């Protein structure tokens, strides 16, 4: 089976380490965990890795966040991957920091990257792994918060959370979404 695993983030070194780029960070960790690496290809950085009997195309789009759907649609079509085998890794303000939630479908929850993907795929029925970044910001401070870097106390917890996110992605490919949600969403 072939899967497209896409981490959402903004391009540019000034965004590295920001909350909004946690999708890139998660897929970097996934690829490193199996000794793979990324190469620049059309619409983004691509890694081709294998997890047991699953072929994973791992994508970090090089489009702006709100145009991520262009990259996702291109790679689904190019690799002939069904939407059921798509997983988007995305930051989520509605979840406390470090909470990971796998969902089989859903709304964009105001996330412009997800909004664009749903628009270009003409469906919201694709899986997403939501990484909680919390919402500890004053009224009107959302943009500064998501584009801000993680504080030291959260960075300290990051390796364990990234390991767990990697386990979830591997399980999604090997066992399917329902078993993976049952196993990980309540932890």
Curated annotation (Swiss-Prot):
Q: What is this protein called?
A: Peptidyl-tRNA hydrolase
Swiss-Prot/TrEMBL keywords: Cytoplasm, Hydrolase, RNA-binding, tRNA-binding
According to the record's subunit comment, the protein's assembly and interactions are: Monomer.
User: Does the keyword field hold Hydrolase?
Assistant: yes
What InterPro entries does the database record attribute to this sequence? Pept_tRNA_hydro, Pept_tRNA_hydro_CS, Pept_tRNA_hydro_sf
Instruction: Quote the Pfam families the UniProt record gives.
Output: Pept_tRNA_hydro
Record: active site: 20 (proton acceptor)
Ligand binding (tRNA): 15, 64, 66, 112
Provide the GO biological process annotations. protein quality control for misfolded or incompletely synthesized proteins; rescue of stalled ribosome
> Which Enzyme Commission number(s) are listed?
3.1.1.29
GO (cellular component) term, any one: cytoplasm
Main enzyme class: hydrolase
User: Which family does the record claim for this protein?
Assistant: Belongs to the PTH family.
Positions marked as site (Stabilizes the basic form of H active site to accept a proton): 91
Function comment:
Hydrolyzes ribosome-free peptidyl-tRNAs (with 1 or more amino acids incorporated), which drop off the ribosome during protein synthesis, or as a result of ribosome stalling. Catalyzes the release of premature peptidyl moieties from peptidyl-tRNA molecules trapped in stalled 50S ribosomal subunits, and thus maintains levels of free tRNAs and 50S ribosomes.
Protein species of origin: Parabacteroides distasonis (strain ATCC 8503 / DSM 20701 / CIP 104284 / JCM 5825 / NCTC 11152)
């Amino acid at each position: 089976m072939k899967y497209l695993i896409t981490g959402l983030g903004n391009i540019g070194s000034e965004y590295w380490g920001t909350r909004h780029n946690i999708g890139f960070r998660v897929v970097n960790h996934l690829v490193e965990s199996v000794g793979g690496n990324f190469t620049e290809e059309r619409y983004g950085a691509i890694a081709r890795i294998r997890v047991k009997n699953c072929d994973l195309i791992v994508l970090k789009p090089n489009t702006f966040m709100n145009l991520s759907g262009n990259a996702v649609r291109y790679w689904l079509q190019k690799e002939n991957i069904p939407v059921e085998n798509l997983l988007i890794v995305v930051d989520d303000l509605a979840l406390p920091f470090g909470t990971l939630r796998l969902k089989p479908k859903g709304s964009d929850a105001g996330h412009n990257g997800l909004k664009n993907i749903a628009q270009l795929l003409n469906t919201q029925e694709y899986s997403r792994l939501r990484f909680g970044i919390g919402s500890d910001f004053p009224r009107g401070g959302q943009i500064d918060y998501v584009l801000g870097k993680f504080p030291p106390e959260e960075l300290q917890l990051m390796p364990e959370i990234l390991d767990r996110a990697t386990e979830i992605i591997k399980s999604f490919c090997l066992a399917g979404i329902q078993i993976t949600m049952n196993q990980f969403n309540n932890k």
